[in-house]
């Protein structure tokens, strides 16, 4: 289904491009490869928006959050990272092939020292659109004990077993008995 949808998108995009393409003589390009005041063609925008490795400036502190005693020069580095669109909200652009790159960075310890050292960073070599991982499902793979009365239950994250927060002795101290199905202290049945 996704393949068919992608094929239809591409076909329509190509048709639109061919229908509206204007052949003009080459004019001097501005910085960034575009002519001044030129409208970027649909196919160019469409092709450049796909999930792929793209140069991204990454803050060094994002990669090395524990190195707070240093000031880095430069403070960010250009890395190839996955970016772009997947044309389906249930998919996300993720790396499928990665490698480390070593860069020389100046590490400054204010009022003490500074030196150029080597630091390793992760680069993305290949990217792919894959189903999004459900964050909530990853954090808690167990289903809820009760939709309406979650506050009455305790759940073991290892076994997913549900047990009552209330205890039988706590209920009996109030002249009630524990209903293990609802985890409430109910009036005794006669």
UniProtKB/Swiss-Prot annotation:
GO BP: cellular response to hypoxia; induction of positive chemotaxis; motor neuron migration; positive regulation of angiogenesis; positive regulation of cell division; positive regulation of endothelial cell migration; positive regulation of endothelial cell proliferation; positive regulation of focal adhesion assembly
Pfam families documented for this protein: PDGF, VEGF_C
Glycan-modified residues: 100
Protein name: Vascular endothelial growth factor A
Source organism phylogeny: Eukaryota, Metazoa, Chordata, Craniata, Vertebrata
Subunit text: Homodimer; disulfide-linked. Also found as heterodimer with PGF. Interacts with NRP1. Interacts with BSG. Interacts with CD82; this interaction inhibits VEGFA-mediated signaling pathway.
GO MF, any single term: protein homodimerization activity
Annotated compartments: Secreted
Superkingdom per UniProt: Eukaryota
Keyword field: Angiogenesis, Developmental protein, Differentiation, Disulfide bond, Glycoprotein, Growth factor, Heparin-binding, Mitogen, Secreted, Signal
């Amino acid at each position: 289904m996704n393949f068919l949808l992608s094929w239809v998108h591409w076909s329509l995009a190509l048709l639109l491009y061919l229908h509206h393409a204007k052949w003009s003589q080459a004019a001097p390009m501005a910085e960034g490869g575009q002519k001044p005041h030129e409208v970027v063609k649909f196919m160019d925008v469409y092709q450049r928006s796909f999930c792929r490795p793209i140069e991204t400036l990454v803050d060094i502190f994002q990669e090395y959050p524990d190195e707070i005693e240093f000031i880095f020069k430069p403070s960010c580095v250009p890395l190839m990272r996955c970016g772009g669109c997947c044309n389906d909200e249930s998919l996300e652009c993720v790396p499928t092939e990665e490698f480390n790159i070593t860069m020389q960075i100046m590490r400054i310890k204010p009022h003490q020292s500074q030196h150029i050292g080597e630091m390793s960073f992760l680069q993305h070599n290949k990217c792919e659109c894959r189903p999004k991982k459900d964050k909530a499902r990853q954090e808690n793979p167990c289903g809820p004990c009760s939709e309406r009365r979650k506050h009455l239950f305790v759940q073991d994250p290892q076994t997913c077993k549900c047990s009552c927060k209330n205890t039988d002795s706590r209920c009996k101290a109030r002249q009630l008995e524990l209903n293990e199905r609802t985890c409430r202290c109910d009036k005794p049945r006669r």
